[in-house]
Amino acid sequence: MRHGIVLFTCDRGITPARAAKAAEERGFDAFYVPEHTHVPVKREAAHPRTGTGTLPDDRYKRTLDPWVSLATAAAATSRIRLSTAVALPAESDPVTLAKTIATLDHLSGGRVTVGAGFGWNTDELADHGVPAGKRRTVLREYVEAMRALWTQDEAAYDGQFVKFGPCWAFPKPVQTHLPLIIGAGGGPQTFAWIARHADGWMTTPGEQDISGKAAALRQAWAAAGRHGIPDIRVLVAAKPSPGDLAAWAAAGATELLWGLPDAPAEAVEAYLDRLAGRIAIR
């Protein structure tokens, strides 16, 4: 299994560039950052971890832009993959976002993986004009439209939420296919969506025993006529035992995502030293 690092970016603590550089130097395979454009003060949507409107971490209100963060990380590194856990594409203009991601892939030498979510904070999405009951449809259209812009010399798209006429959009990504991983609670609807439109699944923190869900995803994958196997990335929520690591590997996990502490830069680097030693990647 590969090992990635997740930095909950905010306006304090270690910078994305320094964290990505430290992760790369210690042998980690990928660097992830999240996205929230803003958090409405009054919300109806419950947070998945608290079950209420209470946020479990004040960094939700202070999150840095993910693509700017990854651009600084790209400039400080040469090997580590650059990703999001997760981005919310529906909160951006799709043509502009396609340009941003293609540019990042171009300038980083083809190191981008898009981790995307449907969005639990429906109040946040509503401020961007996304109807709560149409989140999956909107994301599908964004993905289809951006892939057209990334792969076609003259791209056009005509959907319910995304429309643009024939246009030129360069640069194209270095990668002929930009990987798309969906971070969402595992279930039949999500797995069917992934099997049709994405390359893999990223678990939520509450999903640690994934054996049954991984099998269900592979069944949906085969039913959709997909070849190979889906990418499965586990967001590690606590300090796992060797048995947990073995169980994830047996279930088909391809990558484990380890969160960084909300701490000063030196403390984060010391944590990375300990983590790299514990999982024996150095």
Summary of predicted features, one role per range:
Residues 1-282:
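Active-site-adjacent structural elements that line small-molecule/cofactor binding pockets in enzymes
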